[in-house]
Amino acid sequence: MRRPRSRGAAKQTRLREADEIRLLEAWIDAGKPARGTRPPPLSKSSSSPADTAAAKRGAKGAGGVPSKAAGEHPEYGACARFDELPLSNKTKDGLRKAGYTEMSEIQRAALPHALCGRDVLGAAKTGSGKTLAFVIPVLEKLYRERWGPEDGVGCIVLSPNKDLAGQIFNVFQKVGKLHGFSAACIVGNRKGLDEEKAVINNMNILVCTPGRLLQHMGETTNFDCSQIQQILVIDEADQVLDKNFQEQVDNVVSQLPKVRQTLLFSATQTKSVKDLARVSLKDPEYISVHEEATTATPDTLEQYAMIVPLEQKLNMLWSFIKRHLKSRILVFLSSVKQVKFVYEVFKKLRPGISLRCMHGRMKYEVQQAIVAEFKEGHSVLFSTDIFARGLDIEDVDWVVQVDCPENIALYIHRVGRTARYNKRGKALIFLCPEEEKMLEKLKAAESKIPIHIKKPNTEQLQQISQNIASVLVQYPNLQQLGKRAFVTYLKSVYLQSDKEVFDLSRFSMENFAAYAASLGLPVTPKIRFVSHKKNVPKKYMGDIDVKRMKRSSKPEVIEINPQAKSNLIEDDGDYDILYPKEQQTDVNMADGLDDVLYPKVSTADTNNEPEKVTQLGNKSVKKKKLKINVHRPLGTRVKFDDEGHTIPPFASIAEEVGSGDVIDKDKISQRYAEMLREMQEHDKEDKLEHKRILREKKLQKKLKLKRKRNEEMDAGSENSGSESDRDQRTASKGKKRYFNSDDEEGSKDAAKDGDVLAQQEALALKLLSKMHS
């Protein structure tokens, strides 16, 4: 059994830590780098600067901290190893046990400035070690401040999603396990909110999502970060500071102290003054270690693009998986319904490799279990963009993007799931012919993305549309899921802001029908996109009054050309249609507008007048609310008859009275007296009837009690003999008898029987008296 430490040993430990902190602070102040400086690149022959040898020559105390007697504090702004930094012994031991010895470029550039207490805005390629670049400063900051459980929250790390927050928390556990700090991972969509509220005030480090943290700030008792918080870290800062998290982040930052250290890291960093002012960055150090690099992606990443028609994407994906059964593949799709549908269908078709899917609607524990299973061996993971940022999985061989990303930054984050930490990886993206503009943007000089075009091998392309259709017949629920996948994909394309790449009008009706057939659907689902007129392409607007459209706030329907509408087989499902039912049948459009989307045009008046866009309401039209004129004079209500003529307000309910009709008051009073007399007679009858009913109820109750008493007496007579008979006779003499009027004959017979019995008893007594005499 381990013996507890004595008070003297604990005191010696505190003194030793105080001396170490004092030496570390002196070292940091003496050797801190100048603002705006960056470490020089390392030469291949040496792994550390020249002054590293002097630092290793015995000018160290215990654990690698320079002793006070040495009188020197080596510079650490250009070191290459973690043990050359002014770090505590506990942090160095944790790094060594976790296997971290050499620093990456972002760590060499960011750690010296972060250890000095400066705000840092860091950007580096995916997989370059950004997480460790802020974990170490957090641990050292709290250690030098002698932070303990009673001090409360000292650091908050914000993450855009649950999975990345869990990954950051694991790094804190590995590196800081020798420290005595308490840490918690606080994310949404998981159970245990009450348990979190009970312990959150005792936590020193919180790794959380903005929404969950804001919930605790508003609901948890005594949870206050306005005075004690020391350091704020935002990972994937460009996404956290995006408009999707804007309100949450602003509310969180408003409750934090103004004096603090702030660290921001991401692969695609923002330098917007407005965004940086929101998190109160003060004179930050801008660190972009790969800013001068020739590529924005890792050098070990091979990137390919393939032009694939929309209806051939699933066939191409299936063929690709069948040719790479010994690989670990990550597949990105644009919507949750697509992920579910492709996963379920491919699972039924059995490609010969394990399949998994992950999306944002899963519980946090389920997501963690799926990630752990995906790390084990060869597998295919279908995912939404929840997996695109920050998650670290080793040895991902291929990243396949079936759907086009919304921008260059998302593309970089997606392909960054492979080729991490100088390992090799490959990425492939499927682009429709209508999306070739994205390929031009990827190959542009400012993007720095070396991507190669790869032609599909049609000979090895496997057609699985019929197989998918047979699966949908066997599993009807998958057919509904396929319809939703079809709708959500078109909706995702329609809602994208970059219309140079995502323009739904470039797709023809044949494309939609073929895409639905590739999903195994027997008919093409109907969808309705309601949009404002400002989203209608200008080349399809003709002579429409643009100024009038800008003033209008009513929704407008974008419909498909009626000439191409006949090529589709309509579906009677519960999906809205992309086009409304046409009000006119004679619609003539130019040949160049066939099979494309164009604004609905009214043909009510076509006599040499410019065509105007007809405003169509939604399926359920709401009635316009009428306003009451409060300034109108009283008594001015107006009503109309069936012919539209004005009538007095109460004329419609008044009775028409002839001119010869006269009201007779005597007849009215006579009728009233007659009714009163009838009511009095009925009252008398009702009272008599009520009395009779009460009398019968009372009699029935008495008879019931009598029968019960007689039964008890009969039972007692069997046990007590003649004594019981005497009691019965006595009781019968003193009690009254009640008989119904309908049973008079029975009562007379009973009286005769009683007289005979009395005579017999008297005779028996007489005989007994003679015998005794």
From Swiss-Prot:
Residues 43-56 have a biased composition (Low complexity). ATP binds at residues 124-131. Gene3D superfamilies: P-loop containing nucleotide triphosphate hydrolases. Residues 699-708 have a biased composition (Basic residues). Residues 664-715 form a coiled coil. Its EC number is 3.6.4.13. Residues 28-71, 699-755 are annotated as: Disordered. A motif (DEAD box) lies at residues 235-238. It holds the Pfam family Helicase_C. Residues 309-462 form the Helicase C-terminal domain. Residues 111-287 form the Helicase ATP-binding domain. It catalyses: ATP + H2O = ADP + phosphate + H(+). It comes from the Eukaryota. GO terms for molecular function: ATP binding; ATP hydrolysis activity; RNA binding; RNA helicase activity. It is an enzyme of class 3 (hydrolase). GO terms for biological process: rRNA processing. GO terms for cellular component: nucleus. A motif (Q motif) lies at residues 80-108. Keywords: ATP-binding, Coiled coil, Helicase, Hydrolase, Nucleotide-binding, RNA-binding. Belongs to the DEAD box helicase family. DDX10/DBP4 subfamily. The Q motif is unique to and characteristic of the DEAD box family of RNA helicases and controls ATP binding and hydrolysis. This is DEAD-box ATP-dependent RNA helicase 32. The lineage of its organism: Eukaryota, Viridiplantae, Streptophyta, Embryophyta, Tracheophyta.
